[in-house]
Amino acid sequence: MKTPLQQLVGSLVIAQACAAGAAEPVDGQQIVRAGTTPAVVGPEATFTGHVRVEQLWPATPQITASGAYVTFEPGARSAWHTHPAGQRLVVVSGVGRTQEWGKPVQELRAGDVVWCPPGVKHWHGASPVTAMTHLAVSGALDGKNVEWMEKVSDAQYTTR
């Protein structure tokens, strides 16, 4: 179940993105109701552990950023990756981790906001014992918003 903050942020952003991305002029707001977008399991090639991705809106010519809720179960994480136009993460629940290549692992908590600059190699996911959900807003450049790399090893994940 989503928290009121998740529902509010998701509803506001979806409404804005849908209205801005419509092919025809719109006389008013468009609303996509919470829970109407199906979640998918994060692919094994780019995630370790159980991850659910709920795509909220796609990048459009009007707003060149996509958005999704990503939920990582305890111990789950992304592979190393970069974003050609950057990514902002808003942790909405739980406890997580992130790491920039060559730097220490950082802990994330609900309410934290992370800016991942373009081209910076990093990963993010849940803590070993607590799930974490974040809202990911990823900029797109030439239709691409991520470059996936190798998986994060258990040693990299557990090193503090």
What is the meaning of each model-derived region?
Residues 12-21:
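Hydrophobic h-region of N-terminal signal peptides that target proteins for export
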Residues 21-64, 146-160:
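A short, N-terminal "cap"/entry segment at the start of jelly-roll beta-barrel domains
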Residues 52-55, 66-83:
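Conserved short histidine dyad/triad with adjacent acidic residue
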Residues 77, 82-110, 120:
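A short beta-strand-loop-beta hairpin characteristic of the jelly-roll/cupin
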